[in-house]
């Protein structure tokens, strides 16, 4: 497979994946495929999809479900949601969280346009009316700081937790009682693109990289 993954590759990644997956992935990709030249763009799903349609990107990493007509997609991994809360919060004593316990909580989420926001609400079976949306942030790091200051709770994807988004805060993480409170991360490219085999190879590489980090 050494003749695959050579030349230039333009990869788009959404902001709730890029900062947490790319740093270690890029180093290992460079070591394994030194002839691969990567150009990276981080943006919201809708913009990345447009760049992909227009041929400005070769493939994109994003979260499903997301409507992608004319594109081939492959699933990479499930990214579990965890509830993040500050010490002393009334949900702290719960070993695991039932989705119904989120109703009426002060919930901190990303602003409109970030698909993580919709995926988190959907995965937790929450309507906007069920929650008290007290703050809309621009990044997961911002949300973590707001929780640390006692302003509410938030939902964090496992990939961000593995990449130590909590830093040196004393925040608590709780799993949900229900299985599959998660989003699905995948790759997408144009159906007409002849490099399908390379993209499937890259998908395997990313999958392995993420699994290795989560088992560390």
Predicted regions and their residues:
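Short, well-ordered beta-strand segments
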Residues: 8-12, 60, 84, 108, ...
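Alpha-helical linker/hinge and terminal dimerization helices associated
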Residues: 1-2, 202
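Central regulatory/effector-binding core of bacterial HTH transcription factors
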Residues: 4-69, 130, 137
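Secondary-structure junction motif
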Residues: 92, 106-127, 195-203, 213
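Beta-alpha-beta core module
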Residues: 68-75, 79, 94-95, 141-191
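A late-sequence structural motif
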Residues: 21, 172-214
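Hydrophobic hinge/microswitch elements
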Residues: 44-49, 53-57, 62-63, 113-171
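Short loop->beta-strand "edge-of-pocket" segments that line small-molecule binding or catalytic clefts
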Residues: 12, 81, 90, 97-117, ...
